[in-house]
Amino acid sequence: RSYGRMLGMVAHLAHDRAALQDLLGLLANKQLVLIDTTGVAPRDPRKDEILDLLDLPGVQKLLAVNAAGQGDALDDVMQAFKARGSSQAILTKVDEAVKLGPSVDTLIRHQMQLRGVTNGQRVPEDWERADAQQLVSASMRASTRSAFDPKALDLDFFFPPSSPSTMDSEV
């Protein structure tokens, strides 16, 4: 309800499918009705129950994707929710992402239609339309080196330079 007030909208609460159907009937003349659910992890047993509530005619599911998420975790989310009919996404927390590559890659590979991005905590000021060129460009540059980027000393330790004489003796 607090988000509704911040956006200048009336927020309603639906505890079950019947209540949601009733509300959607009352709001049928509205141009846009947003349904916000509790966030659930891909393997959360409540996921199917929550998504079943949204299996109603005319309801389009948008998946909120954390831009700061780790690549394999994002892939897991996409697989779980795309299987349940999600084909559109909002890329959130872009301002918190150290690297955008994993999230942009995951959206592209899963062919998700990106509807917008969020760049901060202020609603609705920090909402932006998705700009493919800007996102791809941002994902290709890193403002800082990662702690996981190899350093020359590390590479020399794990992969010592080989000399021709040591290679001959190993054969």
Descriptions of predicted regions:
Residues 1:
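Phosphate-binding active sites in nucleotide-utilizing proteins
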Residues 4-49, 55:
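Switch II (G3) loop of P-loop NTPases
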Residues 20, 50-51, 78, 103-104:
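Generic hydrophobic/aromatic pocket-lining and core-packing "Φ" positions
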Residues 33-37, 82, 86, 135-144:
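A polyampholytic, Gly/Pro-enriched intrinsically disordered region
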Residues 40-44, 57-74, 97:
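Conserved Switch II/interswitch segment of TRAFAC-class P-loop GTPases
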Residues 58-65, 82-124:
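Conserved beta-strand/loop subsegment of P-loop NTPase cores
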Residues 107-171:
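NTP-binding/hydrolysis catalytic cores, primarily Walker-type P-loop NTPases
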